[in-house]
């Protein structure tokens, strides 16, 4: 009799355990995400859709995900180990980054090199030389640190105001826009500190480049 009672108690506990697991799975894995997605789609439709930025009626990026710009008349972003997941396809459908290396798939993060790692030193040296070649009026000592260092995610869409301003002369020559006009574009796309005290002032690279494209007549509608 005691053995039967023990078996009954065991299976009852097992049933309760599976029941709780199933309920939590449904609540946390289905009900909560669906409810949260539904509420956010109604209250914050743009943010729920990825905070997309539009130009000429089509999505060209997101406010919170950086992308790689290679044209000389566009502002440059911070380094990214995954080139901001920007790639091109050849005739055979093979995907490559802009430097010709194979596309690694959609990724984020960085190489996490130690400061003493020779690979990091070589990467920074190469990036400095590339930047100086594109910005001949700038000296090595004037380059802001964030232009040579990757963000934690490798996808940061912002740079510092100093990093934006130092690129203005070269962009002015390549785009035909005046430095004053470019300075105003940078100011228009500068976001201040949160509540005036948290974080640092930042410049949206995508926002700046969309305004540059609009000023050059490359896009007819700027949808920030």
Label each region the model flagged.
Residues 8, 12, 16, 20, ...:
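Flexible, solvent-exposed loop/hinge segments and secondary-structure transition points
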Residues 1-8:
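Short, Lys/Arg-rich, polar N-terminal cytosolic tail immediately upstream
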Residues 162-224:
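Extracytoplasmic/periplasmic C-terminal soluble domains
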């Amino acid at each position: 009799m005691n053995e039967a009672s023990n078996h009954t108690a065991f299976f009852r506990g097992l049933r309760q355990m599976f029941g709780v697991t199933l309920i939590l799975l449904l609540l946390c894995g289905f009900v909560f995400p669906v409810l949260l997605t539904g509420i956010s789609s109604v209250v914050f439709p743009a943010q729920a859709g990825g905070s997309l930025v539009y130009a000429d009626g089509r999505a060209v990026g997101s406010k919170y995900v950086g992308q790689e710009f290679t044209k000389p008349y566009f502002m440059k972003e911070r380094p990214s180990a995954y080139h901001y997941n920007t790639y091109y396809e050849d005739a055979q459908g093979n995907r490559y980054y802009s430097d010709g290396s194979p596309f690694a798939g959609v990724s984020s993060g960085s190489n996490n090199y130690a400061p003493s790692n020779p690979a990091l030193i070589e990467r920074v040296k190469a990036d400095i030389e590339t930047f100086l070649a594109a910005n001949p009026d700038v000296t090595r000592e004037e380059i802001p640190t964030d232009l040579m260092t990757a963000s934690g995610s490798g996808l940061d869409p912002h740079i510092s105001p100093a990093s934006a301003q130092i690129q203005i002369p070269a962009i002015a020559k390549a785009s035909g826009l005046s430095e004053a006009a470019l300075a105003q574009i940078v100011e228009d796309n500068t976001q201040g500190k949160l509540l005036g005290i948290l974080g640092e002032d930042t410049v949206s690279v995508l926002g700046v480049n969309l305004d540059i494209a609009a000023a050059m007549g490359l896009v007819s509608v700027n949808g920030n």
